[in-house]
Amino acid sequence: MYYTREYLNRAHREIDTIFRVLFPEHGMAVREEQIMLCHEMLDNLLGRNIALCDAGVGIGKTYAYLVACVLMRKYSLLAEGCSPYEQRPIVISTSSITLQKAILTEYIPFLSRILQENGTIQAPIKAVIRKGKEHFVCDERLEQRIVAIEEKNKNALQKEALLSLKEHYDMDEVSNLSGFDRRMVSVPKFCSGDCPKRGSCRYQQYLERSRDHEMFIQICNHNYLLADGYHRLQDYRPLLKDYRALIVDEAHKLPDAAKQMFGKSLCYDDIREICFYLGNEYQGPEIRKLSGTIRMVLDIIGENHRTRYGIKEEFHMTEECAMYLYEGIQTMNKIIEKLEKKIPKWIRNKLEETRSVLEYFFHQDKKYVLHLKQDHDHRIILCASSRRIPQYLDQMLWSRGMGAILTSGTLKTGQGFSHIRKMTGLQRVRRVREYVADSPFEYQKNCLLYLPKNLKTCRRESQEEAEMIAGHIHSLICSTYGHTLVLFTSYHLMGNVYQMLRDEIPFPMIEVWRHSPEEITRFKQMDNAVLFAAGSCWEVVDFPGDMVSSLIIVKLPFAVPDPISEAQKKEYASLKDYIQAVIVPDMQKKLRQGFGRALRTETDTCVVSILDERAGEGGRYHEEVMCALPSCKMAKDIKDIQHFIRNRKGVEYYL
């Protein structure tokens, strides 16, 4: 596509006007790094390149890519006219629902308003969040469900939630809706063409709005983006309207979404779901045979392996496992052959997927890493993780030739982008450009890094280690008068240390386990509390201001070995090569995510301590740690920390 030099110059001048004039008029700071990032993004979108943009904390990358997209469309329409291609929307894919909602309800309305007021654009920017039909209400099924519960003594909150769906067709907007009600009223996998409510169906109206030619931005999560790509690859009907450019925010999560998307699994709930749908139409011995045989397969495999909740276990074939897997495959063959022409396509697909998983395990298919894990009820799940994720991403996304921006605060690891390029299938793609936008925050002034020199080497997960760590944490908390976030990589170690300190610390202490958002909210409402956390708190939670003035990273966040990483290791010539190519970059990415909790605004000040002897001067991974983090002043001892806090905090901090 050809753009005149004049149009390019005008587009770049408008970037400067937007960020240097319009945004400051509405109370936003001028950030040179943000402006340069936007220029880079625009050039790559117009040139149909794929840009890997590592954007440091506080850059404002969301406005950077939104402005770039708006100007790309404006000037490509001026240059090429109103061709069908130029009028195609752009897609923004993110990992988190929170960011999707913020883009739709905060970023886009603000940007649209000020650009219209200025005359940069003539019409509002229209956007929609796209997601699977299981999130939406089927009006026909809702009506049937309401009738079914009229005479029943249903939980009042759940009943109120169900009735509220008359006003809200997006079930994610409704609280207290039971999982069973959600399944009973959601849009079915295949809608009947002669549905009596099709003409007034709110879901169909939502789809029509999404396809409107004025709908410039389609927002979705990574899984939906990949599902659309898979549909296109298989010549199925696409989920998204044809688009001309792609923005992947939180791009470091794209490989994980692809692993989930292209991995296969089989568990008890899968069989129960299939039998439930078959049982509604086909009562007979086939259903009992299906349920009994597959449950027995899962039971036998579970008995032949020692599995623990939360731990992936490698699958090992035994004679007994082989016998029951073979029987399961034969049972599936007979059921599929008998019911093939009597059942809907989606149920047949479910049966075929079940058979496929059994075949992967029986034949020990080398295209997959075969492993086992437990569900919440400690029942076995068969898992097959694809070894071809990079190739799938290339085929579904990058080979289509459109411009794309992949951005995140943790794309770069160590000295470059080689790790993320390999993970996302971009290793051999020539049109990739790399760009680093450093954080505008003054880390040298506002952040103090402490790597204790007196850390004792202890056996991992031992009582001695927990006591040593507890002692250091106690000293640090008292030095900063609370206001502390302690990040663990192990829930077991976190629990031990918490029990040791709960009665020793003169500040409120909160321990966050899995799925405990209410505890995080409680911490934010306190003035000088201490939060012990692990898991998602490494990356998805914001603590601006003084609430986190001390961040303690207990251990370097190395991934726990599992069957998938063991399979990866075999691809490298030596263990050292594998550690440097995979293990260290993964650790650096997670470390940067955790470190990012320290400063969330330009005025934040924080002490960051890492209590892992491998990170300290002379430690095994000292250079890798320093390479991953921004340049900060170093603390020699606790006195330096106390001095830093006293000099940067006001009287109200201690109240």
Over which residues does each language-model region extend?
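Conserved RecA-like ASCE P-loop NTPase motor core of nucleic-acid helicases/translocases
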Residues: 88-98, 405-409, 482-489, 610-611
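A substrate-engagement module of RecA-like helicase motors
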Residues: 2-24, 29, 76-218, 222-223, ...
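Conserved helicase motor "Helicase C" RecA-like lobe of SF1/SF2 P-loop NTPases
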Residues: 489-513
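Walker A/P-loop
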Residues: 47-67
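Conserved RecA-like P-loop NTPase helicase motor core
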Residues: 452-464, 515-616
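Conserved interdomain hinge at the start of the Helicase C-terminal
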Residues: 395, 454-489
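Signature of the SF2 helicase/ATPase Hel1-core->accessory helical subdomain module
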Residues: 65-67, 71, 98-101, 105-111, ...
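A contiguous, basic/glycine-rich beta-loop/short-helix subdomain that forms a polymer-engagement track
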Residues: 189-216, 229-237, 335-453, 465, ...
